[in-house]
Amino acid sequence: MLTARLLLPRLLCLQGRTTSYSTAAALPNPIPNPEICYNKLFINNEWHDAVSKKTFPTVNPTTGEVIGHVAEGDRADVDLAVKAAREAFRLGSPWRRMDASERGRLLNRLADLVERDRVYLASLETLDNGKPFQESYVLDLDEVIKVYRYFAGWADKWHGKTIPMDGEHFCFTRHEPVGVCGQIIPWNFPLVMQGWKLAPALATGNTVVMKVAEQTPLSALYLASLIKEAGFPPGVVNIITGYGPTAGAAIAQHMDVDKVAFTGSTEVGHLIQKAAGESNLKRVTLELGGKSPSIVLADADMEHAVDQCHEALFFNMGQCCCAGSRTFVEESIYREFLERTVEKAKQRKVGNPFELDTQQGPQVDKEQFERILGYIRLGQKEGAKLLCGGERLGERGFFIKPTVFGDVQDGMRIAKEEIFGPVQPLFKFKKIEEVIQRANNTRYGLAAAVFTRDLDKAIYFTQALQAGTVWVNTYNIVTCHTPFGGFKESGNGRELGEDGLRAYTEVKTVTIKVPEKNS
């Protein structure tokens, strides 16, 4: 049984981490029962109960049992957090007067602390989210550390320029922080999404009020303690735990929040955009849902394409906004591809996420679990051919067998709607123009992939597919160096890379009258 106690002394948490490494293997042993050190709201570098004194349970998806209870923030708590963030952002505050290079040093210090506590954080993520420890440790924590270091390097390099202009004038631009930024993150990659949003916002000098997903609050709260330990001034980062319709809506509607960044469903994205428009026209960036196509041409490396399309869908239990959730295969190789795909899905190890050879853990919660099973039943009802999986695994926790559907038609709901689970629909196509039209026939446009040995065809697909990211002969390659975001209803704006900084700065033009201008 995985259990955890609340509010234990920090020393006990440190003891749990320092003894966890295995000297016999590159991958350290996880901590199956990580102690829970923080369960309150983090406002102004202090821990607070919710104003209402309410709490809510966070559940271990591996067992379905409650790990502990966390403060349930709402509008009153958001008001306090925004007030703290606004004070930290006032002219003359320690944060506003801090050198840009010092902001970078603090971000690097935060990365150092994450690296120090990597095993503990990965274990906490696996406990609360259900993802396999090997993925939490190797993939997620690696990305978290890199994203803080990457934007630390940008802190003193993101600046304006001088502009030659007519007349007796001197002109330059300033890249100024937007101000108080509301950030709302999802449950599928809690620490990664926290880093994607915090790092560029802090590198450019903003202050933050972040609402973390109610399903996975624990790792974000622990990282808040590292923010304080790193030396960030009070009020610069504030972390609220609570529900979307209360705490999340309060951030989106708040008249003293200058920008909101949201990652989550397209449906909630519409609500965020509407709330921003009906309040103070705050800046908005949205990273939303997807129904991303993976297109396999007849000349592709078959084994590689099968492997990549498998991971494109089943990675992170299918709970990935850019999951390759529509696999289009050219007719001449469809049968062989289908057989290999089904065999690979059957071989995928589903089980305890703390076991190092587990490839797939549970879905994040009961609601998501039941939603996915509902889509599987719907696919069967609509006439898609269930080739493997299609049911829960075991009687405990929220496990679903890897599921593959064949002979899926474009009009089926499993072909059009975001399932967000381990369900891979396979489609057959004959011609390139046909599959491009079908791939683009969706309200989404987050990502796409094409598998081919023909460079001319590959380049043509990268131009024709309506998606913010197009991969060629690979999938899910997302790094802190490259911009990420969607077309159409998959969102607006970009995160990561140099483009990710633009969302957190305003460009100010300064023009000065000079008595005499010389070149």
UniProtKB/Swiss-Prot annotation:
Q: Per its record, what are the GO molecular function terms?
A: aldehyde dehydrogenase (NAD+) activity
According to its UniProt entry, this protein's organism is Mus musculus (Mouse)
Instruction: State where the protein is found.
Output: Mitochondrion matrix
Q: Which Gene3D superfamilies match?
A: Aldehyde Dehydrogenase, Chain A, domain 1 (3.40.605.10), Aldehyde Dehydrogenase, Chain A, domain 2 (3.40.309.10)
Q: Which Pfam families match?
A: Aldedh (PF00171)
Q: What is its main location?
A: mitochondrion
Annotated metabolic or biological route of this protein: Alcohol metabolism; ethanol degradation; acetate from ethanol: step 2/2
Q: Binding positions for NAD(+)?
A: 264-269
Q: Which GO terms describe its biological process?
A: ethanol catabolic process
Q: What is this protein called?
A: Aldehyde dehydrogenase X, mitochondrial
Q: Recite the UniProt keywords alphabetically.
A: Acetylation, Mitochondrion, NAD, Oxidoreductase, Transit peptide
According to the record, the segments passing through the membrane are none
Enzyme Commission identifier(s) = 1.2.1.3
